[in-house]
UniProtKB/Swiss-Prot annotation:
Protein keywords: Viral occlusion body, Virulence
Family that this chain belongs to: Belongs to the baculoviridae p74 family.
Function: Essential for virulence of baculovirus occlusion bodies for insect larvae.
Protein name: Protein p74
UniProt keyword 4Fe-4S present: no
Domain of life of the native organism: Viruses
Gene Ontology biological process terms, A to Z: viral life cycle
The keyword Ribonucleoprotein appears for this protein: no
């Protein structure tokens, strides 16, 4: 019997992802109704999305889910105040370290899941990041590191001993209006900052007036600046420097009612939602029920915009559903004699273990270990969910159909893990959590940025700090480092954040896995021909109504241990080499032990005849040496094993 190919398993995972995304809309509405979302529904295309089996032509969808403009603003979280990072007890407020006030500790920082935020150890684990909404209708992650550097001078250093770096007013910070760089923040000089260094704000930079330049030429810039700073009481201000109000020239900090802000954030609702229509999303709706089929038989795309409503546009697919041609009825290379579910699962896992056996041979031991651990965790959760799905479904499920569904579920689980751990978005969230953990963490990340501040100016000479181009150069440097620290090999693409990146707030992994199994089963059952053109004939297998969950988990874990013949040969080679080396190192142990045993017997006889203590001492020494050489070989073997393993 033919089985699903890698292409089929990938298509099944894509189908399940789109259908799960459709159901996810309703779950998001229930859990986070105040975070508004947009979505687009259209019939799936075999060319652009995934292969659509003929049996699914009336319900296969491509679903796109994104934050609306207001939803993106509601999800934004800036986690730094003047002197540190926010915690789960920090209330919403503003900083006023420059002429522009900056809000921090927005409700999204710790109120997406308040119960999780209040658990021990989660005090500094922010639940969101800082975003901006672009003209292209994307919720984009911004470079909060540069914003923090511009706005919170205290966080620039750890020891706070470098004069003129952290004991200064902040730069005015604002988002870059350039649509090509929505992630970027721009810094600007202000009068308070220039005054701190004995200069005046002129043409966007900090400069001397023309007559001050003449005086500085005669006295020297350093001497003139010192007298000017004394006259402006700068030194007295530095003795009692307040990082929250670094200059008397700055406006007062805005007063914020954090409780009112939180209540307003929670009270937001999308009045344009059609609840009766969206209720269908969890009931496997057809294209006709969703209104994606026009009266003339054409296909439609349905786009929902929060607080506005629906908009339909016609779309055209050429040959949207083309049945696969049957090329090979026999499929001799893909047969299983034993149709037991355990055999199907074990065969699948062992087949993939060969691939990772090769990876081990060329040096990917860490990859193999991580894959083993991941596979065990997946199987431990997946097989119980598979049984729940089998009991809950109303369709006839055969052994082979369930086995192929299991394979697709493994691939789908790995795709989900990859999204959460390997994507640029996941890396970005991880960095936000690290930066929000401590001030030390912030400084460490600053020191790892490429071409950081010290590459641009000398903090003690102040030679390049005051031209109006300096903040722009600094901003560009941070933006470059922002991309390079996320992924040195990635393209400079905008990092869009989607609601599904926050699925942990809405649903558990077990629930997501269980719901996805039904979609995977539907897709696998609808396939009649695999991507190689082989007939599948899943219905010809025996029906299955239940299975021993514990036994199958054990069978899967044993199969996924990836203990291949290659590993066995490597293990036996190491053991044989160790035994041979140990034997060579202890080649004369037997002869030496025999000599000491002979000496022991002679010393014992002499002691019994002459009753002298000297002979007894010889007897004891010879006996201990003989025993040592008798146990020396096994002792060294097990000692080496303990060190190696």
């Amino acid at each position: 019997m033919a089985v699903l190919t890698a292409v089929d398993l990938t298509n099944a995972s894509r189908y399940a992802a789109h259908m799960h995304r459709l159901e996810f809309i309703g779950r998001w509405r229930e859990r986070l109704p105040h975070i508004l979302i947009d979505y687009t529904l259209r019939p799936a295309s075999s060319e652009d999305d995934y292969y659509v089996p003929p049996k699914l032509r009336d319900r296969a969808l491509a679903v796109k889910l994104a934050f609306s403009r207001r939803g993106c603003d509601s999800m934004s979280c800036y986690p730094f105040h003047e002197t540190g990072v926010v915690s789960n007890q920090t209330e919403f407020a503003y900083t006023q370290t420059s002429e522009t006030s900056v809000a921090y500790s927005q409700p999204a920082c710790y109120h997406l899941d308040r119960a999780a935020a209040m658990r021990e150890g989660a005090e500094n684990e922010v639940q969101s990041a800082e975003f901006t909404y672009t003209p292209n209708n994307q919720c984009v992650l911004v470079d909060s590191t540069s914003k923090m550097y511009f706005n919170s001078p205290y966080l620039r250093t750890e020891e706070h001993t470098i004069m003129g770096v952290d004991d200064v007013p902040a730069f005015n910070v604002r988002p870059d209006p350039d649509p090509l760089f929505p992630e970027r923040f721009k810094g600007e000089f202000n009068e308070a900052y220039c005054r701190r260094f004995g200069r005046d704000l002129m043409n966007g930079g900090c400069s001397f007036r023309w007559w001050e330049s003449l005086i500085g030429f005669v006295l020297g810039d350093t001497i003139y600046v010192t007298f000017k700073m004394m006259a402006n009481n700068i030194f007295s201000e530095l003795r009692d420097f307040d990082y929250t109000a670094p200059s008397p020239l700055l406006p007062a900090r805005p007063v914020a009612d954090s409780n009112a802000v939180l209540a307003q954030w929670r009270a937001v609702r999308d009045r344009a939602v059609d609840w009766n229509f969206e209720k269908q999303f969890s009931e496997a709706p057809t294209l006709q029920q969703l209104g994606l089929l026009a009266d003339n038989g054409g296909l439609m795309q349905l786009a929902y915009t929060a607080e506005t409503g629906f908009a339909k546009t016609p779309i055209a697919y050429s040959a949207r559903v083309t049945p696969r041609a049957v090329r090979d009825f026999g499929a001799p290379g893909r047969q299983l004699n034993d149709e037991e579910l355990e055999a199907i699962i074990a065969s699948f896992l062992e087949e993939y273990s060969l691939v990772f056996g090769i990876a081990t041979d060329i040096g990917f031991d860490m990859l193999l270990t991580a894959f083993k651990t991941m596979l065990k965790k997946i199987n431990t959760a997946l097989i119980p969910a598979l049984k729940r799905m089998l009991v809950s479904t109303s369709q006839r499920v055969t052994v082979r159909l369930l086995g192929e569904t299991y394979k697709a579920a493994i691939v789908h689980s790995m795709n989900r893990i990859a999204i959460k751990t390997l994507t640029t978005a996941a890396k970005a969230l991880t960095r936000i959590a690290i930066k929000a953990s401590s001030v030390v963490g912030i400084v460490l990340i600053l020191f790892t940025l490429a071409d950081l501040v010290l590459a641009l100016w000398d903090p003690f000479g102040y030679s390049n700090m005051f031209p109006r181009e300096f903040p722009d150069d600094l901003s560009r440097t941070f933006l470059t480092a922002y991309f390079e620290t996320l992924d040195a090999n990635s393209s400079r693409e905008i990092i869009e954040f989607l609601p599904e990146f926050f699925s942990d707030v809405v649903e558990t992994d077990d629930d997501a896995t269980f719901q996805s199994l039904f979609h995977l089963l539907d897709y696998v059952a609808a396939l009649e021909v695999n991507s190689d053109g082989q007939m599948l004939h899943f219905t010809e297998s025996n029906a299955i109504e239940d299975f021993d969950e514990a036994t199958l988990v054990g069978q899967a874990l044993a199969s996924s241990s990836l203990y291949t013949r290659l590993e066995f040969m490597q293990y036996t080679f190491r053991q044989n080499t160790l035994l041979e080396m140990n034997k060579n190192n202890n080649r004369f142990n037997g002869a030496i032990a025999s000599l000491f045993l002979t000496g022991t017997a002679v010393a014992l006889a002499a002691f019994m005849l002459h009753k002298k203590l000297t002979f007894f001492v010889y007897f004891a020494i010879f006996l201990m040496l003989a025993l040592y050489y008798l146990v020396k070989e096994p002792y060294e073997y097990f000692k080496t094993i303990d060190l190696l393993f």
